[in-house]
Amino acid sequence: MSPCKLLPFCVALALTGCSLAPDYQRPAMPVPQQFSLSQNGLVNAADNYQNAGWRTFFVDNQVKTLISEALVNNRDLRMATLKVQEARAQYRLTDADRYPQLNGEGSGSWSGNLKGNTATTREFSTGLNASFDLDFFGRLKNMSEAERQNYLATEEAQRAVHILLVSNVAQSYFNQQLAYAQLQIAEETLRNYQQSYAFVEKQLLTGSSNVLALEQARGVIESTRSDIAKRQGELAQANNALQLLLGSYGKLPQAQTVNSDSLQSVKLPAGLSSQILLQRPDIMEAEHALMAANANIGAARAAFFPSISLTSGISTASSDLSSLFNASSGMWNFIPKIEIPIFNAGRNQANLDIAEIRQQQSVVNYEQKIQNAFKEVADALALRQSLNDQISAQQRYLASLQITLQRARALYQHGAVSYLEVLDAERSLFATRQTLLDLNYARQVNEISLYTALGGG
């Protein structure tokens, strides 16, 4: 049988050769099978919520616009996308070694005596060479599989960056809203304090008040001005953070007060399975890395066995270019080669040990990712009900303080209490309004964190 007929058979045999990689088994999840959920507000099944993209989750159109802009311009996401392209090219490069390599060549030479008393000698040649490594033990196949899994892991890493960017832009936007709302409350409070100061000043002129009350009124005005300056700085910082995430420094949307209806609340079944975590991109990335480590063990094991390569070629040579392709000028060659590892001072065993240890490290990393993901979801679920309870209590407290302030002002006007009682009520009301804003912002951030932790985005 000629080499040309042997080569396709060898290629087919090598491509279907055995693999020495261990059979892959997904590690057991080192977390409970279900999350502990209260029944409050968790009644609607949400089997498809992971497929509900951020355009569905975020109701606020301004948020959607900002996220769309960030997905186009953000440098972190752009870098992650380039890494995916690099990993894809690396996989193609490694996979190419599994297939025959075919190269053509041609050359011509002219030679003669320097004295010019002999005729010029000419020589022309062409050739076609093929080479192929018979991958009987799966070394190249496993190396290719490892690169494929690395490429898939990079894709999941890019998806994780995408989800994180969506989350960060939304949180930054709501932080801007919070800073603006706190500034608005501080400015409103300053106006109220200034009105109180004017009232106390009039009472001082009529003898119904004293200098101490006037100084107290002036003191809270200056304190509130200081708070306004602080809130202005926080708003500027929030704008800077948002612009960095957007990847551009164009005009930001006008800040608005916090809207509690900016998000579509995540509805969860009472018996939420922890299996849902397996769809998170960071966990899928870790699993692909584990599969790559598994394939590397197969490549390391194959190094203990012989490697066989085939080289074949056809060529022609002639002193006359016109007769270069005559049948009489053609030649062929077929060169099989086998390399058998005999002694390498333990190099192959060390490579296998490294591959096995890295596979064990990948298992630990995979389990850690699952445990961290479980904690993120469990924390968000626990905080969810706590924040709702805190907000309800704070709203009742705010209503009580508003009544207290009204009564304190009425009593002060009739001389029944000192101005200090009014100041205490105003300070408490101001602080409670700020706290309620903080709690509403925390609830929004927690909803975003829960949505992200469950793999949404």
Swiss-Prot record:
Key words of the record: Cell outer membrane, Ion transport, Lipoprotein, Membrane, Palmitate, Porin, Signal, Transmembrane, Transmembrane beta strand, Transport
Impact after mutating L20M: In strain: K1 / RS218
One MF term in the entry's GO annotations: copper ion binding
Effect annotated for changing L6I: In strain: K1 / RS218
Subcellular location: Cell outer membrane
Miscellaneous comment: The cus system plays an important role in copper tolerance under anaerobic growth and, under extreme copper stress, in aerobic growth.
Stated name of the protein: Cation efflux system protein CusC
Organism of provenance: Escherichia coli (strain K12)
